[in-house]
Amino acid sequence: MPIGVPKVPYRLPGEPYTQWIDIYNRLYRERIIFLGKEVDDEIANQIVAVMLYLDSEDPGKDIMLYINSPGGSVTAGMAIYDTMQHIKSDVVTICVGLAASMGSFLLAAGTKGKRLALPHSRIMIHQPSGGTRGQATDIEIEAREILRVRRQLNELYAYHTGQPLEKIERDMDRDFFMSAEEAKNYGLIDRVIEERSN
């Protein structure tokens, strides 16, 4: 049974009374974005809009992107990726639970030195998948496009992890799961969060 979006109390600075706002808006006020579902156009548009707003509001101040996602659309994910690379603010990425496929790509795309994971997180990389129907010519066009996307993702993973392209290509041929510590050694993240800092 769905419970809806939780509401939390919030008091605007200088206001005498508290108002109730949904938890995601409260987190946005702290420059925290939560990707907790499959990456699709709708969630990508929301995340891009929030990142652009937060960057324009206070350029250079960190934005935190928490990721618990099984992956999703490559084109939607690339919209988030390009925005992360474009804005002035550093994007701190934190894996909570699972960062798979496009989720792991966005995790690795955080600002170098600020890519984190909780100790029991799982991270998975693999080649993009897709399917098509139609005439042989259309299928051939789709096949060329998915191979182009695969090359592009492999090159970007190699760039963000420091791994040789050949290793990335081998590892991404099938689902390749890692623990947080293994993801750190691989170069997908920079640090495993072992204890809460004050």
From Swiss-Prot:
Signal peptide (UniProt feature, chain positions): none
Enzyme class: hydrolase
Highest taxon, organism lineage: Bacteria
Family label: Belongs to the peptidase S14 family.
Entry EC no(s): 3.4.21.92
Catalytically driven reaction(s): Hydrolysis of proteins to small peptides in the presence of ATP and magnesium. alpha-casein is the usual test substrate. In the absence of ATP, only oligopeptides shorter than five residues are hydrolyzed (such as succinyl-Leu-Tyr-|-NHMec, and Leu-Tyr-Leu-|-Tyr-Trp, in which cleavage of the -Tyr-|-Leu- and -Tyr-|-Trp bonds also occurs)
Cellular component terms per the entry's GO annotation: cytoplasm; endopeptidase Clp complex
GO MF assignments: ATP-dependent peptidase activity; ATPase binding; serine-type endopeptidase activity
Subcellular location as annotated: Cytoplasm
GO terms (BP aspect): protein quality control for misfolded or incompletely synthesized proteins
Residue positions of the active site: 101, 126
Role noted for this protein: Cleaves peptides in various proteins in a process that requires ATP hydrolysis. Has a chymotrypsin-like activity. Plays a major role in the degradation of misfolded proteins.
Keywords: Cytoplasm, Hydrolase, Protease, Serine protease
InterPro entries, per the entry: ClpP, ClpP/crotonase-like_dom_sf, ClpP/TepA, ClpP_His_AS, ClpP_Ser_AS
Quaternary structure note: Fourteen ClpP subunits assemble into 2 heptameric rings which stack back to back to give a disk-like structure with a central cavity, resembling the structure of eukaryotic proteasomes.
The organism's taxonomic lineage, starting at the top: Bacteria, Bacillati, Cyanobacteriota, Cyanophyceae, Acaryochloridales
Protein name: ATP-dependent Clp protease proteolytic subunit 2
